From Swiss-Prot:
Organism: Hordeum vulgare (Barley)
Lineage: Eukaryota, Viridiplantae, Streptophyta, Embryophyta, Tracheophyta
Gene3D superfamilies: Plant lipid-transfer and hydrophobic proteins
Source domain of life: Eukaryota
Compartments, as annotated in UniProt: Secreted
Signal peptide: 1-24
Chain's role: Trypsin inhibitor. No alpha-amylase inhibition detected.
One GO location term (cellular component): extracellular region
Gene this protein is translated from: ITR2
Protein name: Trypsin inhibitor CMc
Amino acid sequence: MASCSQHLLSAVAIFSVLAGVATATSIYTCYEGMGLPVNPLQGCRFYVASQTCGAVPLLPIEVMKDWCCRELAGISSNCRCEGLRVFIDRAFPPSQSQGAPPQLPPLATECPAEVKRDFARTLALPGQCNLPAIHGGAYCVFP
């Protein structure tokens, strides 16, 4: 009888360890379609362009900001920085200002991509969406 209890206890312990590893792995899995929506934060494109480069807003600024912040809030705090990075790289590629074809149609093409990229990096900060990231703060560090 003790042998059966030991086996059961061992099985529970192994299951707990495996569940912990699976959870830890999935928390930090931030890819499009897994932890991130496909093509994340598209509602932020027009907001960023209107705030940085004088692009004519399609909607009132408050509406665009709210839409952008809701999209960002919908991404787990563990994946927010990666979501911002994917969004920035796709919506405002650095090559856009260097003549290479952008992945998305450019907004406010007369405005350097770096200006839009720098502003987009601040979207989680208190002055914008005020959302925590994985570090417990809102600041995301990426190239």
